[in-house]
């Protein structure tokens, strides 16, 4: 049974007199900085001189420093830039400014778990991982609700790392919803598996395969799009609201019966075995090594695969059909 912490389990007094240096001002960074500040915590933002986020952070009222200046100022240093750049930022800007008693904070365990970043033993290392995009974390904080989060401690040099991490989570508003205790290992491996097998890799390729199957059988691409992609949101919303049981309760009996008899034919033993292999690649660090090598080589395969999928026929069909839906906000992807 999971250990879950709430407002009464966390004390913002553990952040009193401390400065949080938020390094990065993207999806998570802006929300962490604003929520902590609005909870009464002293916050500075660390961004490189050429960062496009500097003006945004300044307009939000923050003192913006270089990453190294912010790391020097911070008692708690939050590493909220993308995984693949964290090691470089740590070595160049953070490691030289670490002192006994400081706490290094993460929102994802990748670089600690896979040994990309190895902090000295006299600093605390913790993680608070809100389970939502940053804009939702911020919006729900403003509404006084909060989103669930995970909390973990990797090093407890001070003897207070857990209390400080829970205070940080409370400053984000997460203890209003509940904060689940975990480890860096568990968070990293389950997060990567979820992305690869279900949320991103699994769903996107299932959609494309369903679309291709219908179109190859002679059905109109527009109709195929609605059946395998557009209606997915309706189903996911039902699952999100009440679990698989609520989705099955809400759909037609025909759809529910098809779920039971045909679902196991799609997600069969071969697929489950493949999932186990994906998990093994994550657990052994094989995937991490592959992703690190891809970045060090300049991402040639990553960019090639991105372009290939952008050219999939489902994208052109989707662009045309979404133009028929004026209630949707137009989303432009930077080139």
Swiss-Prot record:
PROSITE patterns: KARI_C (PS51851), KARI_N (PS51850). Keywords: Amino-acid biosynthesis, Branched-chain amino acid biosynthesis, Magnesium, Metal-binding, NADP, Oxidoreductase. Transmembrane segments: none annotated. Residues 183-328 form the KARI C-terminal knotted domain. InterPro entries: 6-PGluconate_DH-like_C_sf, KARI, KARI_C, KARI_N, KARI_prok, NAD(P)-bd_dom_sf. GO terms for biological process: isoleucine biosynthetic process; L-valine biosynthetic process. Gene3D superfamilies: 6.10.240.10, NAD(P)-binding Rossmann-like Domain. It catalyses: (2R)-2,3-dihydroxy-3-methylbutanoate + NADP(+) = (2S)-2-acetolactate + NADPH + H(+); (2R,3R)-2,3-dihydroxy-3-methylpentanoate + NADP(+) = (S)-2-ethyl-2-hydroxy-3-oxobutanoate + NADPH + H(+). Its EC number is 1.1.1.86. GO terms for cellular component: cytosol. SUPFAM superfamilies: 6-phosphogluconate dehydrogenase C-terminal domain-like (SSF48179), NAD(P)-binding Rossmann-fold domains (SSF51735). It holds the Pfam family KARI_N. Belongs to the ketol-acid reductoisomerase family. This is Ketol-acid reductoisomerase (NADP(+)). The lineage of its organism: Bacteria, Pseudomonadati, Thermomicrobiota, Thermomicrobia, Thermomicrobiales.
């Amino acid at each position: 049974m999971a250990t879950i912490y709430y407002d009464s389990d966390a004390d913002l007094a553990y952040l009193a007199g401390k400065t949080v240096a938020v390094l990065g001002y993207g999806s998570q960074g802006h929300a962490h900085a604003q929520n902590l500040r609005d909870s009464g915590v002293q916050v500075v933002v660390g961004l490189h001189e050429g960062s496009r986020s500097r003006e945004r952070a300044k307009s939000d009222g923050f003192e913006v420093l270089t990453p190294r200046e912010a790391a020097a100022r911070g008692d708690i240093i939050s590493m909220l830039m993308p995984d693949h750049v964290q090691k470089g930022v740590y070595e160049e800007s953070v490691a030289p400014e670490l002192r006994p008693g400081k706490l290094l904070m993460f929102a994802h365990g990748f670089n600690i778990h896979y040994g990309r970043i190895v902090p000295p033993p006299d600093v605390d290392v913790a993680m608070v991982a809100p389970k939502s995009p940053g804009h939702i974390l911020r919006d729900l904080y403003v509404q006084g609700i909060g989103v669930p989060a995970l909390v973990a401690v990797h090093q407890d040099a001070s003897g207070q790392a857990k209390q400080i991490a829970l205070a940080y989570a409370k400053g984000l508003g997460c203890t209003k919803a509940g904060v689940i205790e975990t480890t860096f290992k568990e968070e990293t491996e389950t997060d990567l598996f979820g992305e690869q097998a279900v949320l991103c890799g699994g769903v996107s390729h299932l959609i494309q395969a369903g679309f291709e199957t219908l179109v190859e059988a002679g059905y109109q691409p527009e109709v195929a799009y609605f059946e395998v992609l557009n209606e997915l949101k309706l189903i996911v919303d039902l699952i999100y609201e009440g679990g698989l049981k609520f989705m099955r309760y809400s759909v037609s009996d025909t759809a529910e019966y098809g779920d039971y008899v045909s679902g196991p034919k799609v997600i069969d033993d071969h697929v489950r075995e493949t999932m186990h292999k994906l998990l093994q690649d994550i657990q052994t660090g094989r995937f991490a090594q592959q992703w690190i090598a891809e970045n060090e080589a300049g991402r040639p395969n990553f960019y090639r695969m991105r372009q290939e999928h952008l050219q999939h026929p489902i994208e052109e069909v989707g662009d045309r059909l979404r133009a028929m839906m004026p209630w949707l906000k137009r989303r432009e992807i930077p080139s």
